[in-house]
């Protein structure tokens, strides 16, 4: 296998059907859940990404502990975004303990970094998601024109999930908003009046406040 770059930003050679994982995940519940379903190769020196699904895509994993601890995870995500040419998918543990911190990481990753964000409730759920992503790439050769559609669908799924998490939205209003405002950028720039036409005054005010309120520091645990 080709040696990986020292900064861990890729590209990394990943055999088809394998996952190259950071050594820090060895022995974790997440790694144990995946073993037997896909082949894991652990490597040192993957500074930014946690799991490489292919030479072009990787996963950056934010744990419950990362969120509760504060903003430390942001430097890693921003460093990856600024230095890597890979398709990065961010998986975040949204649990009962970390739920209060989720809007901040959602806003940072989707609005500030423009990256795909997928919330999971546990490492077990995350393992299923990662395995599914690997299996999709294994089934479809890189030249398959439908692979781009799959990646587009993943981005759309992330977008819908992101909008659902905005205060005042939920599963019913998210698709309605995305029909009129197809991107987070357009939604964030919408006026209260424009939002009212879709979701009514109360929800419109909540959505507008979410995008316009100044960023606050997370309380220390």
Curated annotation (Swiss-Prot):
Instruction: Show the disulfide pairing.
Output: none
Task: Fetch the Pfam families from UniProt.
Answer: HHH_2, PND
Show the GO cellular component annotation of the record: chromatin; FANCM-MHF complex; Fanconi anaemia nuclear complex; nucleoplasm
Gene3D superfamilies the UniProt entry points to: 3.40.50.10130, 5' to 3' exonuclease, C-terminal subdomain
Q: Please give the start and end residues of each transmembrane region.
A: none
GO BP annotations of the record are: interstrand cross-link repair
Designated name of the protein: Fanconi anemia core complex-associated protein 24
The gene designation is: Faap24
